[in-house]
Regions:
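Nucleotide-activated donor-dependent transferases that construct or modify glycoconjugates
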Residues: 8
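Glycine-rich NAD(P) Rossmann-fold beta1-alpha1 loop
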Residues: 12-16
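FMN-binding flavodoxin-like domain, especially the glycine-rich phosphate-binding loop
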Residues: 2-4, 17, 21-38, 49-146
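Short acidic active-site motifs
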Residues: 40-46
């Protein structure tokens, strides 16, 4: 069974909810999924090399991703993610820059095989967000299996 990892950084719980929905979409495609709040992971806590797909998300706060996700990205750079399927997501109130910055890091620095674009939602339960997040998870899972 393929393995996927979803790691999120949240302030109000919306990004966590989106992470859970993305994981659900990946499970629909037959994936075994681990979901972690980035604060639960210590410096050497998990090996990203063990996963077929890696999905990272952060809320946007004052135009930036949360500091805990920035720190995690520096740690993730030490892993071999070249060519692995990936996606980036996040919740936002006003501007929503964090998912795009994570996506760019995963594309250009980690050299991952990313889905078409990051998923940006004001909230998981608003405007079709549940289906959008589940479909995003399905898309990532299919990309990893292609």
């Amino acid at each position: 069974m393929p393995k996927g990892l979803v790691v999120f950084a949240t302030r109000t719980g919306q990004t966590k909810r989106i992470a859970q929905l993305i994981a659900e979409g990946m499970r629909f495609e037959g994936y075994d999924i681990d979901v972690f709040n980035v604060t639960e992971i210590d410096n050497g806590g998990i090996s990203l090399d063990d996963y077929n797909a890696v999905v990272l998300g952060s809320a946007t706060y004052h135009g930036e991703m949360l500091q805990s996700m920035k720190k995690f990205l520096f740690l993730a750079e030490k892993s071999n993610l070249d060519g692995k399927a990936g996606g980036a997501f996040g919740a936002f109130g006003w501007s929503g820059e964090a998912p795009g910055r994570i996506f760019d890091t995963m594309t250009h620095i980690f050299k991952m095989n990313m889905v078409r674009e990051p998923l940006r939602l004001k909230g998981a339960d608003l405007g079709g967000g549940i289906k959008m997040a589940q479909d995003y998870g399905r898309e990532i899972a299919r990309k990893a299996l292609a």
